[in-house]
Amino acid sequence: METKKISYFLLPSLMIVALIFQPMCSAFTIAEPYIHPCMKGFCSFKSECANKCIFMGHHKGGDCIGGLDGIYCCCLA
C-alpha cells in the first residue's frame, strides 16, 4: 500500500490561508464593554452609577444604559 506525501506547496498554502482567515473571523465577534448583569435603580445621575461600580471594584466606573423596561447601571469591563 502506497502512502501519499503532502506536497511542500500545500502545507505552506494552508498555513497562509489560516493566517488570513483568523483575523477575519475574530473581527466578527461582538465585544461587550459592560459587565453583566446590569443593575437597575442607580442612574439618577451618571456619577452615581460610576461611583457604585467603583465601590464594587470595577475601576473604570459605569455607564447608564436605557432599555425597554428602564434605565440600567452597567459597569465597564
UniProtKB/Swiss-Prot annotation:
Signal peptide: 1-27
Phylogenetic placement of the source organism: Eukaryota, Viridiplantae, Streptophyta, Embryophyta, Tracheophyta
Cell compartment(s), UniProt: Secreted
The protein's name: Defensin-like protein 91
Cellular-component GO terms for this entry: extracellular region
Native source species: Arabidopsis thaliana (Mouse-ear cress)
Similarity remark: Belongs to the DEFL family.
One GO biological process term: defense response to fungus
SS bond list: 38-75, 43-64, 49-73, 53-74
Keywords for the protein's UniProt record, in alphabetical order: Antimicrobial, Disulfide bond, Fungicide, Plant defense, Secreted, Signal
